[in-house]
Design a protein with these regions (language model features):
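Intrinsically disordered, low-complexity Ser/Thr/Pro/Gly-rich regulatory segments
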Residues: 1-228
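Long, low-complexity intrinsically disordered regions
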Residues: 220-242
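Short acidic, low-complexity intrinsically disordered linear motifs used
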Residues: 246-264
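Compositionally biased, charge-rich terminal segments
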Residues: 17-21, 241-248
């Protein structure tokens, strides 16, 4: 059984956190090289910056976005870190935001487990923790007909893509939110606030965004690999296995961590 303890919220300037990031970066250099960032990868990071700005214009964001905690398993404890894309705290209420840019609605499924872990850890500090995914839709099929056309195309995906509505129906933890005010009202479910690419362009300006995705779409589809169970940057034990680094167009937590820290 895995339990959590000793949570702390830190800024990215925390010395121990920076030391862990540097240690992880060195370890990564000894593994196979990561692929160069694709346009969609770059856009995902740019969309995150834009939506954090958008949030900051509407609510007061906390600068302490690094969550340090102890993960306890088999009578051993490991210090771990994860970055919160955005966080606001009002009294004893915390609201965590996860920003994802994806062309697959299945990205929501994969985010649920990580965000439930984050909520469990933060509840050791705050009794009520709301969680919201800000989903930037970069090409999720809009209808059953669109899915059928995609599967009948020259280069169909390896598995049928799900509709946004199908994922919301299949995953009870997810709740669609009409606006930001509605997103933070539930301390149990995970809110989903959806943005179009056009909305991100309106916030950031097209000249500041990587929007040339044609070359990305010409790349061969990569096989799926197991995903990390949580957004971990590093661990205090050399006995811990290193999670895999590659995934599809959704943000891989470890790779995203390095990009956000300016270390990749």
């Amino acid at each position: 059984m895995t339990t959590y303890g000793r949570p702390r919220l830190l800024t990215a300037a925390d010395k121990r956190y920076r030391a862990y990031i540097e240690q992880f970066t060195i370890a990564r250099k000894n593994q196979k090289a990561m692929r160069p960032p694709r346009q969609r990868d770059l856009f995902g990071g740019q969309a995150e910056v834009a939506l954090r700005q958008w949030l900051g214009e509407r609510i007061e964001l906390d600068e302490r976005r690094i969550l340090e905690y102890e993960e306890r398993r088999n009578r051993r404890g490991f210090i771990k870190y994860r970055e919160l894309d955005a966080l606001t705290i009002v009294g004893r209420h915390a609201h965590v935001f996860e920003i994802k840019a994806s062309r697959t609605a299945n990205a929501l499924r994969r985010a649920v487990g990580q965000l439930q872990e984050t909520r469990a850890i933060l509840r050791l500090l705050y009794p009520t923790v709301a969680v919201t995914i800000l989903l930037v839709d970069t090409g999720i099929p809009a209808s059953v007909e669109a899915v059928a056309a995609l599967m009948a195309g020259e280069r169909p995906p390896s598995r049928r893509p799900e509709l946004f509505s199908e994922v919301l129906t299949a995953v009870p933890a997810l709740r669609f939110a009409e606006d930001l005010a509605a997103a933070g009202t539930d301390g149990e479910a995970i809110g989903v606030l959806r943005f179009s690419v056009e909305a991100i362009i309106a916030i950031a300006g097209a000249e500041h965004l990587a929007l040339d995705w044609d070359a990305d779409d010409e790349e061969p589809e990569e096989p799926d690999e197991p995903r990390p169970t949580s957004s971990l940057y590093a661990t205090s034990s050399a006995d811990e296995p290193n999670p895999t680094a590659e995934d599809d167009d959704d943000d891989n937590p470890l790779a995203a961590a390095l990009r956000k820290a300016g270390l990749s």
